[in-house]
A protein has these predicted regions:
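Short beta-strand/loop motif that positions the catalytic acidic residue
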Residues: 158-161, 165
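Short, proline-enriched alpha-helix->beta-strand connector loops that line the catalytic pocket
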Residues: 105-106, 152-157, 183-186
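C-terminal catalytic histidine-bearing segment of alpha/beta-hydrolase fold enzymes
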Residues: 174-196
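Conserved alpha/beta-hydrolase "acid-adjacent" motif
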Residues: 32, 166-172
Length: 196
């Protein structure tokens, strides 16, 4: 049984879902933070179920929110261990949802924000079967130097970042696009001017 749960928006056409869209929220938020985006996407994907799980850990800086992993220590080994634990949890959740709905990775997309983008990229590029797409807002690649050896699939990726983001510098998205392109991954990045 998955450790993750959160809000769900069922298909608009009340049919059995043919697609799964999973939102991965940012540090200190929860699943409610992103599920509202489903209302804007659903008209184009009426046969999709939208899932927005809470990350697995309570957030150290915001006890009302959640985190995928703790980065406050600044210790790379501790952060990496947290990333790996969160990746296992997210992978298990994805597998459970795919099995529950009788779908495969090619019917799945991940949409992440900030730390959720970090997890979406980390997990999505290391799954044995390629998912339909990854969309990431205001994130970065975690341990990009390890990706070449860990890479198992190459889903198309679209990255968006504001050029005045106060938390994660937009250069992280530019660097991610460069690294992913070097690995022959179909990636596009958009830097939004005058946007956090």
């Amino acid at each position: 049984m998955s450790l993750l749960n959160g809000p769900v928006l069922e298909p608009q056409d009340s049919s059995k879902p043919a697609k799964i869209i999973i939102f991965c929220h940012g540090y200190g938020a929860d699943g409610n933070d992103l599920i509202g985006l489903a209302n804007y996407i659903q008209p184009q994907l009426p046969d999709a179920v939208f899932l927005s799980p809470n990350a697995p850990e309570k957030c150290g800086l915001n006890p009302m929110g959640y985190q995928w992993f703790d980065f406050q220590s600044g210790d790379p080994a501790t952060i990496w261990k947290g990333v790996l634990n969160a990746a296992d949890t997210l992978n298990n959740y994805i597998d459970e949802q795919l099995q529950s709905y009788g779908l495969s990775d090619d019917n799945l997309a991940l949409i992440g924000f900030s730390q959720g983008t970090m997890m979406s990229l980390h997990v999505g590029l290391r799954r044995l079967n390629s998912m339909r797409a990854i969309v990431g807002f205001s994130g970065r690649l975690i341990a990009p130097e390890l990706l070449k050896n860990d890479l198992k699939s190459k889903p198309p990726i679209y990255l968006i970042h504001g050029d005045i983001d106060p938390m994660v510098p937009y250069q992280e998205t530019i660097d991610a696009e460069k690294k992913l392109s070097e690995l022959n991954i179909d990636v596009q990045a958009h830097i939004s001017p005058n946007t956090q």
